[in-house]
Every structure is written in C-alpha cells, then in structure tokens.
Amino acid sequence: MKASMFLALAGLVLLFVVCYASESEEKEFPRELISKIFAVDDFKGEERECKGFGKSCVPGKNECCSGYACNSRDKWCKVLLGK
C-alpha cells in the first residue's frame, strides 16, 4: 500500500515537472521566433549563392549557376545546351 501511494505521488510530481517545463518553453517561443526573424534580415545584404536546376530566376540577371541558364519562357534555371 505504501509503495503504490509513493508511486502515485512520484507520478504526479513528474507530471507537474513536465507540464511546468513545457509551459516555460512556450513562453520563450515568441522571443526565439523574433530573434530568428531578425537574424534572417541580417543575411539579406550578403550576396547569395547561384541558383541550381529548377530554381526560379529573372531572365537577364545571370542568377543561375554555371552550366545553367534562365529560361525566359518558364523563368527557371535549365541546363544550358549547345552554347
């Protein structure tokens, strides 16, 4: 009887600890999200890598990687053939 009471009490304490931990993580989530948004803004000024096969592009801007060309009709990088 004593063992089952102790086990039930330990289970309730464990449940309380898990709920408290998950609730504190939820409170920090908006702060983490905002910091990640501002971290993404820091990278906007940097030069981006070239775009590979199937990535959207703007014709004439030379955004595609070497061996690919921006198709003016489909507006995505395709394999450059013949040139």
Curated annotation (Swiss-Prot):
Propeptide: 22-48
Free-text comment about domains: The presence of a 'disulfide through disulfide knot' structurally defines this protein as a knottin.
Entry's localization field: Secreted
Note, other: Negative results: has no effect on mammalian SCN3A/SCN1B (Nav1.3/beta-1), SCN4A (Nav1.4), SCN5A/SCN1B (Nav1.5/beta-1), and SCN9A/SCN1B (Nav1.7/beta-1). Has also no effect on sodium subtypes in rat DRG neurons containing Nav1.1/SCN1A, Nav1.6/SCN8A, Nav1.7/SCN9A, Nav1.8/SCN10A and Nav1.9/SCN11A. Klint et al., 2015 worked with a recombinant peptide N-terminally extended by an Ala residue.
Impact noted for substituting residue 54 to W: Low gain of inhibition activity against hNav1.7/SCN9A (IC(50)=2.7 uM), and gain of binding to anionic POPG liposome. Important gain of inhibition activity (IC(50)=440 nM), and gain of binding to anionic POPG liposome
Signal peptide: 1-21
Oligomer and partners: Monomer.
Recorded superkingdom: Eukaryota
Tissue: Expressed by the venom gland.
GO molecular function, one term: sodium channel regulator activity
Keyword Signal listed: yes
Listed result of changing residue 71 to S: Low gain of inhibition activity against hNav1.7/SCN9A (IC(50)=4.0 uM) and no change in binding to anionic POPG liposome. Important gain of inhibition activity (IC(50)=440 nM), and gain of binding to anionic POPG liposome
Disulfide bonds: 50-65, 57-70, 64-77
Xref: SUPFAM superfamilies: omega toxin-like (SSF57059)
Species, as recorded: Cyriopagopus hainanus (Chinese bird spider)
GO cellular component, one term: extracellular region
Major location (coarse): secreted
Protein name per Swiss-Prot or TrEMBL: Mu-theraphotoxin-Hhn2b 1
Modified residues (Leucine amide): 81
Database matches in Pfam families: Toxin_12
Record's keyword terms, sorted: Amidation, Disulfide bond, Ion channel impairing toxin, Knottin, Neurotoxin, Secreted, Signal, Toxin, Voltage-gated sodium channel impairing toxin
Family indicated by similarity: Belongs to the neurotoxin 10 (Hwtx-1) family. 14 (Hntx-1) subfamily.
Keyword Lyase: no
Role description: Weakly blocks the rat SCN2A/SCN1B (Nav1.2/beta-1) sodium channel (IC(50)=68 uM) and the insect sodium channel para/tipE (IC(50)=4.3 uM), without altering the activation or inactivation kinetics (depressant toxin).
PROSITE patterns: HWTX_1
